[in-house]
């Protein structure tokens, strides 16, 4: 898609990346494998009647008169290869029986059962190959194949053999904005009257009510890892807790309150067994015999800050605790909410019940966020470099349609092995540390790994005092000394340990651990310290550790279900004294839930192939006997081999086979490179890329040609090479590239080559497939008028990184009615800022005065330039938002969308549907009968298309779980979609079916994917942009998945939803204009 950034002000990159598997390491480059990793109106929108729809007319003038639409506004029908397809604006003839009432998608019953007549037969005739003839509009295509293509909506000039296709002269951003305003004068948007003004504050927002439950699809029963929790009939009381002196440790606070309960439960607490949140609140099931009382508590301090050079007496720590009545927790409103008679969830009551059920596990296990871990809950697995995985379980109480529900799931995370520090350091460095001195890099690695870790000393027999490491000494142990009195007498650490403890330090060349604070440094030799058990490792894992951890967490559905049931049995909630005290009873059976399996959509391929249409089977299909619906053109390409294991002949053979596969798949791909293949060393990547590019351009430039594609062969473990190559190609040279790993070059399977061909095709301007329903205008609330579909996400640096910026990405469809191609923009913003700051911007320009910009505005202009029409409907899929951030994100980002639209013309306010996409939840769905092959896929998971919108969903709001993909390994995680704003008034069937069908349009593979592609692309676009950051802020050492790039809870990794203000963030480098025009990110 060709589009320009308005005024050249923003550094947003045109991105919409295709995703690597989450388990694939960063150095895996871009190689494609054979598997993919993976109505009642709402309360918000106005209910004014909309004006009559005016597709293709009513003042919608194309951006360029030579690309004016050919179709009449009344909707004459066009006879094309695909049978009688309707022109833009014509009535859609819905046929009964094939889908939900508003989604009659071809003459098919249920899951692909063909009705009499079947698919329309695509015959020769007017129009492009394999698709209906329809009105032409301007959609710039950079690389057009020489074969006849799908031209449903494009009139493009003949491509040149020596370079990219000629493009129509594009209007500037100012001209496009002027056209928006002209259109407003000629004919007001038919949807603008249906828009409700943005609420004055987030508190006034009401999320849409559920518009009824879906009915489309084959009904079935699934089991969910939700357990019914009976609401207690108790009088809950809240008390404020003040502990003096204040300590940051929840563990210490709990110990203080625990001491009070042990000593004073009967005498002062009236026999009550309270629960405590570790901070400021204590709850009881009934009143305490006082409204305010002070307690004095003494704890033995086991976490000493004293070491070498100070007294060794164990301290007693006195605390003064004031417990004061605060309020009664009202469960009546919770019951009203669960019954659907109250809009807002009473969060306080839910929090109390959650604290009650967490009290006992917190005492038994190691709590991490909402999970609990123990070495006794499963076998430990070594992850390498001194780390091990612990098994545990996630637990959270949730309001659902069936009432209160306890969500239990299995989890694993990394803990530091309880090793002697000497052994830990040896494992960390993967060498014998006594052989040679530590390098500066070794010291940095050790310090980073051990800072904040708790250790216990081993040189004093049974007296195992504990300390927290604050740093590492710069000197060796033998060089360290400290004063022992006020007269300046100095003693070395080696002498002190020999004389005081009779301990001879052997590793005197190693640094000491520094404990305590920096002002009063205290030293502990490494060899007298052992790491305390039960410390979670919160820093970044390397690739091998991630792979090892994923192997531990990967469980087949039946095994996971059994483990969950065993966990519930082991927790014995019926014997939990705190649950008994508060009257909470937990059903130990998995929830049985009604579900539906949505049918897969028909996909359109080119008519020149033997198979022109395909109906996916169990979420997958292949490219055999099919050709891409729009094959791209690659006239001029070259290859650089960065792998020392691949010989030139093998590399040339691989490139030739790949070129042939691209041709077979429907592309116009030259067999021979424009310049011969060359081999280069990874450390010389920039020199090699620029030299090869210049050599190719010396040949092509006199002919008016361009280098269309670079094929790069990378080592399997390539460090930062992949990121460096992408940054140089896309921000410096203006070149799209395809990276292939050495192992795939040697294997060279047909499946792999076919997958790579899919990626190359969309990188050079082609399309792989299109929904047939899109071509026949049968997608409700998408096909009836120009609709733009957005995806947005923010990825954050790992919690261990203190200052790296967060990356926001927004992608948007650029073709209508196909909704297949997505342009994207990215932006760096303040560290861990969740609200997308650059959706809309206004700034002062010295020459032009007040200027508007931002990602939404730029993508709307891009859509207008590509289609010749303004979007009359916006569907916005937002990834990465937790429930606690719903109100802030909706209020801030919906307001930005509104302002971006209004900046293009005063009354331009297309209706918006804002949907949050969540994958980081713990709901799992299991087949009711694992042995029934009709209800499970080959991996034992539920079938793709399984949707649930009852029982375990929100009591009143519009949400659903959708498993849109087939499982590969482990247990499939359904995506959770929650509608926060809906001015388009989707029905449950309409939005569920649209979302499911879009999951079959992901460009990089012939499988349906687990989340809707625009959200998928946005996540990947943001991930790709990290490669563009300068080395001092970029994190190029590891390829952590989304699960490792987001923090949670009120810890250092917490995300902020406060506007960032004027925090200075280094902008990302600009992409080259010719790269922006294509889907280079796949």
From Swiss-Prot:
Keywords per UniProt: RNA-mediated gene silencing
Superkingdom in the source lineage: Eukaryota
Domain PAZ residues, every copy: 420-533
Piwi domain mapped to chain residues: 709-1030
Provenance organism: Oryza sativa subsp. japonica (Rice)
Keyword Transport applies: no
Record-linked PROSITE patterns: PAZ, PIWI
InterPro entries noted in UniProt: ArgoL1, ArgoL2, Argonaut_Gly-rich, Argonaute_Mid_dom, Argonaute_N, PAZ_dom, PAZ_dom_sf, Piwi
Function, as annotated: Probably involved in the RNA silencing pathway. May bind to short RNAs such as microRNAs (miRNAs) or short interfering RNAs (siRNAs), and represses the translation of mRNAs which are complementary to them.
Gene3D superfamilies: 3.40.50.2300, paz domain, Ribonuclease H-like superfamily/Ribonuclease H
UniProt KW Iron keyword: no
SUPFAM superfamilies in UniProt: PAZ domain, Ribonuclease H-like
Biased composition (Polar residues): 29-38
GO biological process terms on file: regulatory ncRNA-mediated gene silencing
Location of the region described as Disordered in the Swiss-Prot/TrEMBL record: 17-148, 187-208, 1036-1065
GO MF annotation terms: RNA binding; RNA endonuclease activity
Protein name: Protein argonaute 1A
Compositionally biased tracts (Gly residues): 72-100
Classification via SMART domains: DUF1785 (SM01163), PAZ (SM00949), Piwi (SM00950)
Gene Ontology CC annotation, any one: cytoplasm
Biological classification of the source: Eukaryota, Viridiplantae, Streptophyta, Embryophyta, Tracheophyta
Pfam families: ArgoL1, ArgoL2, ArgoMid, ArgoN, Gly-rich_Ago1, PAZ, Piwi
Family to which this protein belongs: Belongs to the argonaute family. Ago subfamily.
